[in-house]
């Protein structure tokens, strides 16, 4: 077997090999002898099956196994010659060529290798930033919102008209201009928060001003973009009877509120304000990190470090991004791409720079995470998936199984590592800024 291994750069290598027919036959003979020791074939004692019988019965399979084993041997020899550890090889080697002739098999394997990245000086590109401040007005507004959310609706005793913000209990029945009833357009003892925008424009505004026990016909027009096309743009009448008006009880902003919110018997309003200030600051900082600083940091890291990228990993990322684009295409566009290889190749070329950037960022994040001791346990990945599934009202086990089947768990884990790493780097920068201030 002739082997010619070559490193194209730090992240890519090729293996050219010629496997002679005799090599394949020898390997078939060896495999047949090993199988003969263990196989049970009627008419022969166990371990006494002649290799010729094995070859006759399993000829095609033996040939495939022999070729596969010789390919592995060629790969192992090439890796040893090039000084590449098996653990450093990324993904499966790809056949750029595999031609079977009568006397020889000619093949070319492409190998992707994990690049060595010198991350010296990464601290220099972590962006500086001013820590967000929280005003007293923002704190007061948030406490008022929290108090409003805690407040209960109570039926009013005074005889006054309904107004925006009230919770009213109504019966309604809707009909079109021709007198036909609107399907799903009727209800009894329906609770409606006036000003919520829950009903079509004009409905809630006309309920405002009604009193308890009053019945009124409300005229409205369904919007042109109303989801139900049969109703879009049509005029309708709703006969509405108002039964009850409720308003939110007023909650005093004081120590008693603080005790309820902080679940502490000795809590004070000042403590509550301090906790709310911290929460608001955390929210602002999170928004600053996610919307501005993290993208800026990734961009800076990608620009700072230069290294070779394994072609097979870049191609995989191109496939991912291509599939994402295809998900937004029409059937006609997808069909055209399938039938027009030149156009498909053009699209891949168009995607390639962004794919390279994504792969490069992943390698940098991986190297920095190791340097900074940042990791995410598999159990944390599962917990995150469970939490997000519950938030969406989905079955966590089904979501987890789907992600496993689609091979998405490593990508989710890497995204979590990236998020944790970038937050860690920015926090360290912030601490140094405070020390130097």
Curated annotation (Swiss-Prot):
Major location (coarse): cytoplasm
**PPIase FKBP-type domain: residues covered:** 165-251
Subcellular localization, as worded in the UniProt entry: Cytoplasm
Among InterPro entries, the record links this protein to: PPIase_dom_sf, PPIase_FKBP_dom, Trig_fac, Trigger_fac_C, Trigger_fac_C_sf, Trigger_fac_ribosome-bd_bac, Trigger_fac_ribosome-bd_sf, Trigger_fact/SurA_dom_sf
A single GO BP annotation from the record? Answer: cell division
Q: Name one Pfam family in it.
A: FKBP_C
- The keyword Aminoacyl-tRNA synthetase is annotated on this UniProt entry: no
Q: Which GO terms describe its molecular function?
A: peptidyl-prolyl cis-trans isomerase activity
GO cellular component entries: cytoplasm
Reactions that this protein is recorded to catalyse: [protein]-peptidylproline (omega=180) = [protein]-peptidylproline (omega=0)
> What Enzyme Commission number(s) apply to this enzyme?
5.2.1.8
Per the similarity annotation, which family is this?
Answer: Belongs to the FKBP-type PPIase family. Tig subfamily.
Q: What does this protein do?
A: Involved in protein export. Acts as a chaperone by maintaining the newly synthesized protein in an open conformation. Functions as a peptidyl-prolyl cis-trans isomerase.
What's noted about domains in the record?
Answer: Consists of 3 domains; the N-terminus binds the ribosome, the middle domain has PPIase activity, while the C-terminus has intrinsic chaperone activity on its own.
Q: Which HAMAP family match?
A: Trigger_factor_Tig
Protein name as annotated: Trigger factor
Instruction: Record the organism.
Output: Nitratiruptor sp. (strain SB155-2)
